[in-house]
Amino acid sequence: LVPTPNAAPDPRNEETRGLLIHSATPVHNDARRLQAVLEGGVLLNGNSELVDRLNAIIYRDGTLPLGSKGTATLFLGDTRIATNVRLFAGERALGTRASQVVREHVLDEGKVWLDTAFVVNDYYVSGYEPVLDSYGERVGMLYVGFLEAPFSDAMQGALLTLFDDL
């Protein structure tokens, strides 16, 4: 785990759990009798392809203000296990954690977060949603967001232009 500003205290040093997509389907013979079960899974920890694809679908070219960037993250608990959020050195922010206020709202209370949030090292316009396991228990979060500053600057410029003409 990477020390993260505004995250809840956590005595752990590392994330030892895994989050995976698991699927199984029956295989029947011609007489419709069960012959086998085909089972498979994909470990989502470190799965950059998933968040990069999600990010590409949501934030197409030209949809954000100049200087902003779209981001997506999959959390196990409040820990980033797949993300395109970057640390200062440009590496993916794996092992960093969500802020305590987001964690409480989404994981503890089971609510969707649609607001500004501190994400690793800056403020983002953010959406977080609980990820549920097959028993309906909250096990993580899905996040998408974009840098707040370029959006705020563009909105402020638009408002100044609008009211300057009045």
Regions found by a protein language model. Give the residues of each.
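Short hydrophobic alpha-helical segments used for membrane anchoring or interfacial signaling
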Residues: 64-67, 71-79
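A short beta-strand signature within small-molecule sensing/ligand-binding domains used
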Residues: 3-10, 15-27, 111-114, 121-131
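Membrane-interface helix-start motif
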Residues: 147-166
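Extracytoplasmic/periplasmic sensor domains and loops in membrane signaling proteins
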Residues: 1-12, 47-61, 81-118
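Short acidic/glycine-rich beta-turn/loop cap or linker motifs at sensory/regulatory domain boundaries
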Residues: 31, 44, 76-81
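Envelope-exposed proteins and targeting segments
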Residues: 18-23, 34-36, 70, 122, ...
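Short, acidic, Ser/Thr-enriched surface-loop or helix-capping motifs
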Residues: 29, 75, 133-134
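Short, hydrophobic beta-strand elements of compact beta-sandwich sensory domains
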Residues: 36-43, 125-152
